[in-house]
């Protein structure tokens, strides 16, 4: 073989090695990307479940607070009506029976 052909063969060999390294790097990065995607897909359902659980807990607490507020408002309304009814009876000369201790 002549030196010229040897140089071309060597050049093609170097180019083939560079392409092989590039393909190897691409495969590694592709594998890494796929691993990251599957990791995030596995992690996301757990995060979603935690958020849903937190939302359920917050909703339960909000409902409990709303119930307490409504009960307090109803208690105030009954107390106000009781006072009004007692005042009307006092104006008529009548009264509630109250046991004194």
Curated annotation (Swiss-Prot):
Expressed in trachea multiciliated cells. Keywords: Cell projection, Cilium, Cytoplasm, Cytoskeleton, Flagellum. GO terms for cellular component: axonemal A tubule inner sheath; axonemal microtubule; sperm flagellum. InterPro entries: CFAP141. GO terms for biological process: flagellated sperm motility. It is found in: Cytoplasm, Cytoskeleton, Cilium axoneme; Cytoplasm, Cytoskeleton, Flagellum axoneme. Microtubule inner protein (MIP) part of the dynein-decorated doublet microtubules (DMTs) in cilia axoneme, which is required for motile cilia beating. Microtubule inner protein component of sperm flagellar doublet microtubules. This is Cilia- and flagella-associated protein 141. It comes from Bos taurus (Bovine). The lineage of its organism: Eukaryota, Metazoa, Chordata, Craniata, Vertebrata. The gene is CFAP141.
């Amino acid at each position: 073989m002549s030196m010229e052909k040897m140089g071309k063969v060597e050049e093609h060999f170097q180019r083939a090695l560079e392409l092989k390294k590039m393909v190897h790097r691409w495969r590694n990065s592709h594998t890494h990307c796929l691993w990251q995607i599957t990791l995030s897909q596995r992690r996301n359902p757990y995060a979603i479940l935690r958020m849903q659980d937190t939302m359920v807990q917050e909703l339960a607490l909000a409902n409990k607070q709303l119930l307490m507020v409504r009960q307090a408002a109803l208690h105030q309304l009954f107390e106000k009506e009781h006072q009004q009814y007692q005042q009307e009876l006092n104006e008529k000369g009548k009264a509630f029976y109250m046991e004194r201790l």
